[in-house]
C-alpha cells in the first residue's frame, strides 16, 4: 500500500509539472501597457474594465485585484471606475538597471467564476540623470615622444538612463593638442579615447589641464564634466602587454568574501621606472567596484562582496596595466557566476478564505504563487497537498495556483480541515517549503423564520394616544447565530390608498406594534396589513403574517339634528289645525349620530313645552304628535324643546326647538316662498348634508313601512289609500322638492321640503292632512291606533 501511495503521489506531481510547463508557454501572450518613470502616484495607466470587456459593477462584484509577480504593489485597481492607477512612483533605473526594455509583469484575478488575465507594464525611461564621472580628476602621463594620432584610454562617464537618454557623446576643451574619439564597442557602450592631435613638448609645456564633458541624448540634454590632467614625460617606448585580451573564470555564487578570483599580469620590456606596472579597473561600473577589488602591484582580483546569481549572472571587468612612463595596455576579465541551489521555494498567498459554507462546491479557498530564485533544475518546482482531502490544486498562470474545494462538504462530519501546501524544487539537494492553511466550515441559512400565528387580530379603541402599544407578533428561526436573529418589518400594503406608514410602526427587534396616531372609528373601522420576519442570514430568508386591526367605537359624537334646522335665524313653525284628533302627527325630529352600535341608538323625549300634556314625542322615532283634542282655550303659539340622546357611555345629547302654531283650518299648504331667488347660488355644505341624511333616513323609513305593510297584508286585506299633494296653481319654484309618503299612522299626511341653495331660510313644513274617505269597517282599527298612541304617552283623553 505504501508503494502504491508513493506512485500515486509521483503521478500527481508529474501531472502538475506538465501543466505548469504548458501554462508557462501559454502565458506569454499578455496585454501591454506603458508608463513613464517617476510618474506621480494615482496617475492613470489604463481602464481595465474596458480592456477586459467587463462592466464596472461586474469588476467590483467579482472582487477584481492586481497581483504582481514579485508581490509588490506597484499598481492599484479602482473598483469604482475600473481604472488601473499607479500606487507608487516607479524608478526604472532602480527596477531594471541597464536592462531594456523594463517590463513589470502582473495579472488581474477575478472571482465567481475564477479568471486570470496576464498583463505587462513597460516603464519608459525619462532623462532624469546626468552623466557623472566616478573620478573628479583623470591623470594621464604622456611621453613627449608620443606620435600624433596616439590614443589614450579614459574613464567613461556613468549615466543611469537608457536608450536615447543615455550617454551619447564626449567633448574636450581646450583642444589645441587633443580631440576625443569614440571607438566601436562590442557591448555598445560609448568609451572616450583621447587622441593626440599635435606633438607634445616637455620643455614648452610639462602639464596640460583639460575639461572632459560627457553629454547624453535627452531633450534637453544633460552633461557632466571631469578634469583631465596631462603630464608630459620623457620618452617611454614600450607599453605593457597582456598575454591574452580576454580571461574567463567561473565562480560559484556561494564563494566566501575575500576569496581569490583570478590573477591578471602584463609584461613591459622597458627597464627601471618605465618597466614597473600598476593594475587598475577602468570603465568599471559601481557594481563591479563594490563586488571586486584588484591588487595594483600583483594584479590579483579578489571577491569583495557576496555574489548572487539571481541578481547578476556575469561581470565584464576591464583591467588596465600602466607602466611608470604612462604607457598602458588593457584586457578583459569575464567572471561568470555559477548558480547553486541556495534558495528554497517561496509561497506567496494573494488571497485566502479560512471559512467556507458547508454546502458549497468548488469554492476558492486560497490563491497563491510559488517562486524559486534559482535557475535550471534548481528553479523547477513541484506543488502538492495531502491525499484524501476534499480539496485540489488548480494551476492558473505560470507558478500560480488556486486551492479549491472538490465537492459540497458536511460540517457535521468534520468542522475543519488542516491543509499543508508543499513546494519542492528539483535541485540537489532538494529544498522544500510548507505552508499550512486551516479551513473552517460555516453553517448555512436553510430555515426561514416562522410566525407563531398565520394571522393576528388586534383591537384598539378609537381616540387612542399616539405611540400606543396595540399588540405584538412573534417569529422563531431554527438556525443559530446571525442566521437565527429575526428582524420585523411592515410590508407594503396591498391597498395603495392605505397610509400604513402613518398608522402603525413595528419594533424591528421584538415585533411590538404601535399606533402612530389617534385613530377615528368614523374614518377607519378596520385595516389589514402584512408583517415580515427576516433573518440575518445570507441570503436572508423571510416569512410573513397577516395582521388585522379592528378599531373599537367610542361615544365621541353627539347627536346632530337634521330637522328642524337649528340655525336660529329662521325658526321653523309647524301649523296644526285645531280640529286635529289626538295622535295627529305635528312633525318629526330627524337626527343622526356619527358613532355606531349602541353609541348611535337615539331616543327622543320632550324636554320643555309651553303647555305640558298637549304634545308628546315618540321615544324611538322622534315623531311629535298631539296628545289630546285641541280646544279654543289652548294658546295659539307653542314652543317645544325636544331632547335627542344617544345610548353611549356616558351618553351625549342635543336639543331641537319647535314652534307650533294652532290654526282654525287650512286647505292650501302654508308655504311662504322667498320673494326673490338669490342672484347667485352659493354652495351650502349644511344643505347638502341635510339632503343626504334626509334621503338616507327616508329610504330606511320607507323600507320599514313597506315591510310593515307586507306583514299586515299577510294577516288581513285592507284597502290602501294614497294621499296626494296639492300643488298651488301657477309657476312652481324649481328649488322646491315635493315629497309625499304614506306611513303607519291612521291618517295619511303630506309634507314638503323647501330647500334653498343660498343662505335664506331652510324650512320643513307639514301641510294640512288629507283625510281619506275610509270605509266603515276601518273605524275600529283607527280608534285602536289612537288608543295605542295615548297609552304610549300615558295620557287619558276624554
From Swiss-Prot:
Which GO biological process categories is it annotated with? calcium-dependent cell-cell adhesion via plasma membrane cell adhesion molecules; cell adhesion; chemical synaptic transmission; homophilic cell adhesion via plasma membrane adhesion molecules; synapse assembly
Side Extracellular, residues: 27-686
Signal peptide location in the record? Answer: 1-26
Q: Which CDD domains has this protein been placed in?
A: Cadherin_repeat (cd11304)
List the glycosylation sites.
169, 359, 418, 436, 487, 567
Per the UniProt topology annotation, the Cytoplasmic ranges are 712-798
The GO terms describing molecular function are: calcium ion binding
Topology of this chain in the membrane:
Single-pass type I membrane protein
The record's InterPro entries line, in alphabetical order, gives: Cadherin-like_dom, Cadherin-like_sf, Cadherin_C, Cadherin_CS, Cadherin_N, Protocadherin/Cadherin-CA
> An example Gene Ontology cellular component term from the record?
synapse
Task: List residues traversing the bilayer.
Answer: 687-711
Q: Subcellular localization, per the record?
A: Cell membrane
- Show the disulfide pairing: 96-102
Looking at the record, the residues that make up the Cadherin domain are: 35-133, 138-242, 247-347, 352-451, 456-561, 568-671
Which UniProt key words apply to this protein?
Calcium, Cell adhesion, Cell membrane, Disulfide bond, Glycoprotein, Membrane, Repeat, Signal, Transmembrane, Transmembrane helix
Any idea what job this protein has?
Potential calcium-dependent cell-adhesion protein. May be involved in the establishment and maintenance of specific neuronal connections in the brain.
This protein is called Protocadherin beta-14
| Organism of provenance | Homo sapiens (Human)
Q: Which gene encodes it?
A: PCDHB14
Amino acid at each position: 500500500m505504501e508503494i502504491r501511495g508513493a506512485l500515486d503521489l509521483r503521478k500527481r506531481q508529474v501531472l502538475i509539472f506538465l501543466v505548469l510547463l504548458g501554462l508557462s508557454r501559454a502565458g506569454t501572450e499578455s496585454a501591454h501597457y506603458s508608463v513613464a518613470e517617476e510618474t506621480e502616484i494615482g496617475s492613470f495607466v489604463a481602464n481595465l474594465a474596458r480592456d477586459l470587456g467587463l462592466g464596472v459593477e461586474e469588476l467590483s462584484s467579482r472582487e477584481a485585484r492586481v497581483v504582481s509577480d514579485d508581490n509588490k504593489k506597484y499598481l492599484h485597481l479602482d473598483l469604482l471606475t475600473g481604472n488601473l492607477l499607479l500606487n507608487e512612483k516607479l524608478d526604472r533605473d532602480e527596477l531594471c538597471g541597464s536592462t531594456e526594455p523594463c517590463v513589470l509583469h502582473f495579472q488581474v484575478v477575478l472571482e465567481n467564476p475564477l479568471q486570470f488575465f496576464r498583463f505587462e507594464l513597460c516603464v519608459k525611461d525619462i532623462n532624469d540623470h546626468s552623466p557623472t564621472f566616478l573620478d573628479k580628476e583623470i591623470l594621464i602621463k604622456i611621453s613627449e615622444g608620443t606620435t600624433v594620432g596616439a590614443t589614450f584610454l579614459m574613464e567613461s562617464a556613468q549615466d543611469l538612463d537608457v536608450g536615447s537618454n543615455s550617454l551619447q557623446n564626449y567633448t574636450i576643451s581646450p583642444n589645441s593638442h587633443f580631440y576625443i574619439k569614440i571607438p566601436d564597442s562590442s557591448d555598445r557602450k560609448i568609451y572616450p579615447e583621447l587622441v593626440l592631435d599635435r606633438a607634445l613638448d616637455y620643455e614648452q609645456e610639462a602639464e596640460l589641464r583639460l575639461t572632459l564633458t560627457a553629454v547624453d541624448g535627452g531633450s534637453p540634454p544633460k552633461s557632466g564634466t571631469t578634469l583631465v590632467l596631462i603630464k608630459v614625460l620623457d620618452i617611454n617606448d614600450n607599453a605593457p602587454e597582456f598575454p591574452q585580451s580576454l580571461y574567463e573564470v567561473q565562480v560559484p555564487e556561494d564563494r566566501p568574501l575575500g576569496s581569490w578570483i583570478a590573477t591578471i599580469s602584463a609584461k613591459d620590456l622597458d627597464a627601471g621606472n618605465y618597466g614597473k606596472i600598476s593594475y587598475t579597473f577602468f570603465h568599471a561600473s559601481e557594481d563591479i567596484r563594490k563586488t571586486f577589488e584588484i591588487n595594483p602591484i600583483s594584479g590579483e582580483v579578489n571577491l569583495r562582496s557576496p555574489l548572487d546569481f539571481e541578481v547578476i549572472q556575469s561581470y565584464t571587468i576591464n583591467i588596465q596595466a600602466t607602466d611608470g612612463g604612462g604607457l598602458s595596455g588593457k584586457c578583459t576579465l569575464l567572471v561568470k557566476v555559477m548558480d547553486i541551489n541556495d534558495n528554497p521555494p517561496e509561497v506567496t498567498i494573494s488571497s485566502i478564505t479560512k471559512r467556507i459554507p458547508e454546502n458549497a462546491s468548488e469554492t476558492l479557498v486560497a490563491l497563491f504563487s510559488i517562486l524559486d530564485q534559482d535557475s535550471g533544475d534548481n528553479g523547477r518546482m513541484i506543488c502538492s497537498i495531502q491525499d484524501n482531502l476534499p480539496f485540489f490544486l488548480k494551476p492558473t498562470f505560470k507558478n500560480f495556483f488556486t486551492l479549491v474545494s472538490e465537492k459540497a462538504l458536511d460540517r457535521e462530519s468534520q468542522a475543519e480541515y488542516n491543509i499543508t501546501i508543499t513546494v519542492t524544487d528539483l535541485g540537489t539537494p532538494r529544498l522544500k517549503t510548507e505552508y499550512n492553511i486551516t479551513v473552517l466550515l460555516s453553517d448555512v441559512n436553510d430555515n426561514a423564520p416562522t410566525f407563531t400565528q398565520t394571522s393576528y387580530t388586534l383591537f384598539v379603541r378609537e381616540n387612542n394616544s399616539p405611540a400606543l402599544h396595540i399588540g405584538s407578533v412573534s417569529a422563531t428561526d431554527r438556525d443559530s447565530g446571525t442566521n437565527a436573529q429575526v428582524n420585523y418589518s411592515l410590508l407594503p400594503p396591498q391597498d395603495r390608498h392605505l397610509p400604513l406608514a402613518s398608522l402603525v410602526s413595528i419594533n424591528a427587534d421584538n415585533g411590538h406594534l404601535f399606533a402612530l396616531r389617534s385613530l377615528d372609528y368614523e374614518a377607519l373601522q378596520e385595516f389589514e396589513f402584512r408583517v415580515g420576519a427576516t433573518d440575518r442570514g445570507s441570503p436572508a430568508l423571510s416569512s410573513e403574517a397577516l395582521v388585522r386591526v379592528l378599531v373599537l367605537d367610542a361615544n365621541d359624537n353627539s347627536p346632530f339634528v337634521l330637522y328642524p334646522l337649528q340655525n336660529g335665524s329662521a325658526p321653523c313653525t309647524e301649523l296644526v289645525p285645531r280640529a286635529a284628533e289626538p295622535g295627529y302627527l305635528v312633525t318629526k325630529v330627524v337626527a343622526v349620530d356619527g358613532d355606531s352600535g349602541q353609541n348611535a341608538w337615539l331616543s327622543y323625549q320632550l324636554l320643555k313645552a309651553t303647555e305640558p300634556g298637549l304634545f308628546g314625542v315618540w321615544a324611538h322615532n322622534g315623531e311629535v304628535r298631539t296628545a289630546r283634542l285641541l280646544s279654543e282655550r289652548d294658546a295659539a303659539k307653542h314652543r317645544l324643546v325636544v331632547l335627542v340622546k344617544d345610548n353611549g357611555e356616558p351618553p351625549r345629547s342635543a336639543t331641537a326647538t319647535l314652534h307650533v302654531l294652532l290654526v282654525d283650518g287650512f286647505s292650501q299648504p302654508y308655504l311662504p316662498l322667498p320673494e326673490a331667488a338669490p342672484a347667485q347660488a352659493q354652495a351650502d355644505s349644511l344643505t347638502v348634508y341635510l339632503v343626504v341624511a334626509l334621503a338616507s333616513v327616508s329610504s330606511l323609513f320607507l323600507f320599514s313601512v313597506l315591510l310593515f305593510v307586507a306583514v299586515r297584508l299577510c294577516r288581513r286585506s285592507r284597502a290602501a289609500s294614497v294621499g296626494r299633494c296639492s300643488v298651488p296653481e301657477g309657476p312652481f319654484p324649481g328649488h322646491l322638492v315635493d315629497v309625499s309618503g304614506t306611513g303607519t299612522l291612521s291618517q295619511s299626511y303630506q309634507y314638503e321640503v323647501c330647500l334653498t341653495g343660498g343662505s335664506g331660510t331652510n324650512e320643513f313644513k307639514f301641510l294640512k292632512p288629507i283625510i281619506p274617505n275610509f270605509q266603515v269597517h276601518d273605524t275600529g282599527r283607527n280608534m285602536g291606533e289612537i288608543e295605542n298612541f295615548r297609552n304610549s304617552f300615558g295620557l287619558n283623553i276624554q
